C-alpha cells in the first residue's frame, strides 16, 4: 500500500496499538528547556520514577534568559528560578545540558539541528509549539505539553493519534528577494491559520527544494501557525550535506548506512493525501502581516483589506478586532506604516543565513530616526561566533542595532526584551498575537531582509527595491 512520508514515519515508530485505542509511539529524541520541564521533573520525583533513556534527552536554556548577561546569578525573578531548576534537574538525572556558559547553547530549535541531534526518520518532541521546525529534516517532530514531557522522560514513548496528511506544493522558482519566510507567510495567508488543523503537512515543489536547510527550517517552524500538527520536508542531498560531520550525526559506515535509509524517506508516487494545496512561486511577493494572527498577511505593495468585504462573518469579526488592536485602518498601504522597533531573531529566523540577509541590507546604512531600537539576536552561540567571524556584528552595530547573546528574546514577552505599550515592531518571529512581544505591543511578521530594511528606512519598504551591499 502506498504511503505518505508522514504515514511511513508514524507507522515505523508504533510500539503498541491495541484495537480501537490510540497508538503508542517510540520517541527518538526529546529536547527540553527551562520553562516547560520543571513540573515534569517534579512529577517524576513524586512518582519515584527515573528518566528511562538519559541519552535520548538534551536540554538548553533559551526562553526566559536575558540576552544581555551570561551569568545565571545575574538573572532575576522567575527566569533565575527556571534556569537553576533546569540545571539542578539535568545534573540529578545525567541529561546533557547546553547551558549559557557554553557556545553550543541556543534556542532549542536552532541548537538541535546544529548539533546533529535532529536526524531524518526520527520522532522528536519538545515542550514547545514550534518543534515542527525539525520536520525540515524529514523527522516527525511536534510540540507537547508538560504532562507529556513527564511521560516521555519516564517511558520514552507517547500516545499519539493519527493525523490527516496534507501536501502543499510550491511550484516553480521564487523571484529574486523572496525568502522562505515569504513562502510560508504566503502559504498561511492562503490556507488561513486553521487550514492545517488536524493534519501533518508535507511541503514540496521546486521552490521548497531550492531552499537551504535554514530556509526549510523557517517553513516547517511555522507549520503550527496554519494549525498543523507538524510540518515535513523529505530529506535530500541538501539535508545530508548539512548534517555531515555534525557532533551527534553518524560517522563512518554508520553514516553511509544512515544516508541509504534516509533516501527512502519520501512519499510514494501514488500516495494519497487528504488535502492538497498548490501555490505558484512566481506569484509570491515580500509578505507583511497586518493583523493579529499570521494568516492576516498580504504582500508589501498591497493595502490592508476591508473587513466589510469579507463574506465569512467569523473572518470579518476577527479582522475588525485585529485592526482595532493593531491601530490601522482598511485601505492603508503597508509602505505607509512606520515602525518603532525591529527584532531580528527567534527560532524562525536567527540562523547565519538570516543574519547575512539582514547585514546585506544594513551595511553602509543607519537606523532611521523614528526607530527606537533594533535588536539582532543570534539563535545560538555557534551562530554568534560565525557571525562575528564574518564581521556581521560590526555591520549591525555600525547601523545602530544592538548585538545580543543567544536566546528567544523578543519573540515572546517572557524575558527582559519587550515592546513598550502600543509600540509597533517589524519582527522576524512567528507569532503576532495580541501582547505576544509585550503588553499591548503591535507585531508585524516579516523576513530578516524586510525587518532590516524597516529599521533603516523607518517603515515597511519593498526589499526588491533596496540595493544590497
Curated annotation (Swiss-Prot):
Keywords: 4Fe-4S, Amino-acid biosynthesis, Branched-chain amino acid biosynthesis, Iron, Iron-sulfur, Leucine biosynthesis, Lyase, Metal-binding
CDD domains for the chain: IPMI
SUPFAM superfamilies attached to this UniProt entry: Aconitase iron-sulfur domain
Enzyme Commission number, as recorded: 4.2.1.33
PROSITE patterns on file: ACONITASE_1, ACONITASE_2
Catalytic activity: (2R,3S)-3-isopropylmalate = (2S)-2-isopropylmalate
Binding site for [4Fe-4S] cluster: 347, 408, 411
Similarity remark: Belongs to the aconitase/IPM isomerase family. LeuC type 1 subfamily.
Assembly and binders: Heterodimer of LeuC and LeuD.
Protein name per Swiss-Prot or TrEMBL: 3-isopropylmalate dehydratase large subunit
Organism for this UniProt entry: Haemophilus influenzae (strain 86-028NP)
